[in-house]
Structures are given as structure tokens and as C-alpha cells.
């Protein structure tokens, strides 16, 4: 009996290790809980790129559209630029939100990598990012015709990711 009691801590350690490794192998670090999926897009008034009065409340946006948070300082954002340009050429409406960025830097970024956006809004303080629940950039939201967020992607879009977002809009 005492031999089994002596082995109990070792068995518990092995069991915990198996659970931890199992979780780590199944967990995709790019998939984050998306609290807003299934809910209306947040009501956030953002200033257009280049200045002006905040005039475009994102919560009034009706889809199907993609809302893409990006930054000129973000290397992964540059990686996804070709996928966004391909979506634009297919007629997909994309609204860009320049996250924690300055207008001149955003304009240079768009000249360098292309401008796939129908509208470009700015979030220099990151407040809209908080309201949308982003954890970094790039992040892309698919919004259906009723203004409801139907999908979210928290990494650079690939052509396959873009297709998946478009399929979620078609449902």
C-alpha cells in the first residue's frame, strides 16, 4: 500500500504533463476567442484618413464587407496586402482601420503596398481596437448585411483565409 502512495505524486505529474501537452498540440495560437462574433459591430465613430470630423460610425456599416485593422508599422500587415488587393479586384468591399498609426505613415504604407480599401478610418489612440476586441494587428472582421460580425481572423490573411471569410458572409 505504501508503495502505491509513494507513486501517486509521480502519476499525478505524468497525468498533468499529458494534459498540458495535449492542450498545447490542439491549441492554434492564431485562433483567439472572438467575443463579438455573432453580435452587431461596435458603434465607433472614427476619423477618415487625412483628417476631418469623425463621421463614419462603424456600427452603421452594413455588409457584406470586411473590416481590416492594420498598421504601417506592422510587418504581418504588409504580408497580407496581396490577399487584400486580390479581394478588392474581386469586388469585395473592405474598410480599413489604421490602428495606432499616424496619417503620413499610413499614406506611405498604402502607396507602397497598395490600397485595397473603399474607406480608410483612423484609430490613433487604439480606442476602437479595444471596442472591437482586437489583440493586435492585422485583424479582419466579416460583417453581414445586417451589420452582424460573422467571423474574425487574427493573423495575416492568406487566399484560403480570405475565401473562408467570404464563405462566412455567404451563409
Regions found by a protein language model. Give the residues of each.
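C-type cytochrome heme c attachment motif
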Residues: 72-79, 139
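Generic structural signal for well-ordered beta-strand positions
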Residues: 54-57, 150
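Short active-site neighborhood of thiol/selenol oxidoreductases, capturing the structured segment around
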Residues: 56-75
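Thiol/disulfide oxidoreductase modules built on the thioredoxin-like
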Residues: 7, 111-116, 123-170
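Hydrophobic beta-strand anchors of alpha/beta hydrolase catalytic cores
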Residues: 66-67, 94, 140
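Short, ordered coil/turn segments that flank beta-strands lining enzyme active or ligand-binding pockets
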Residues: 49-51, 145
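Structural microenvironment flanking redox-active thiols in thiol-disulfide oxidoreductases
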Residues: 78-114, 124-130
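N-terminal targeting signals for export/organelle localization
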Residues: 1-47, 171
Amino acid at each position: 500500500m505504501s508503495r502505491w502512495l509513494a507513486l501517486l505524486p509521480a502519476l499525478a505529474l505524468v497525468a498533468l504533463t499529458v494534459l498540458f501537452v495535449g492542450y498545447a498540440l490542439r491549441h492554434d495560437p492564431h485562433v483567439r476567442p472572438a467575443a463579438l462574433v455573432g453580435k452587431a459591430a461596435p458603434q465607433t465613430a472614427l476619423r477618415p484618413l487625412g483628417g476631418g470630423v469623425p463621421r463614419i460610425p462603424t456600427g452603421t456599416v452594413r455588409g457584406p464587407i470586411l473590416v481590416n485593422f492594420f498598421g504601417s508599422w506592422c510587418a504581418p500587415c504588409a504580408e497580407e496586402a496581396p490577399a487584400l488587393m486580390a479581394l478588392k479586384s474581386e469586388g469585395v468591399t473592405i474598410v480599413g482601420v489604421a490602428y495606432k498609426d499616424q496619417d503620413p505613415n499610413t499614406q506611405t504604407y498604402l502607396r507602397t503596398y497598395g490600397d485595397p480599401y473603399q474607406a480608410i478610418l483612423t484609430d490613433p489612440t487604439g480606442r476602437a481596437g479595444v471596442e472591437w476586441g482586437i489583440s493586435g494587428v492585422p485583424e479582419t472582421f466579416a460583417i453581414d448585411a445586417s451589420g452582424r460580425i460573422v467571423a474574425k481572423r487574427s493573423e495575416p490573411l492568406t487566399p484560403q483565409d480570405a475565401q473562408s471569410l467570404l464563405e462566412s458572409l455567404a451563409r
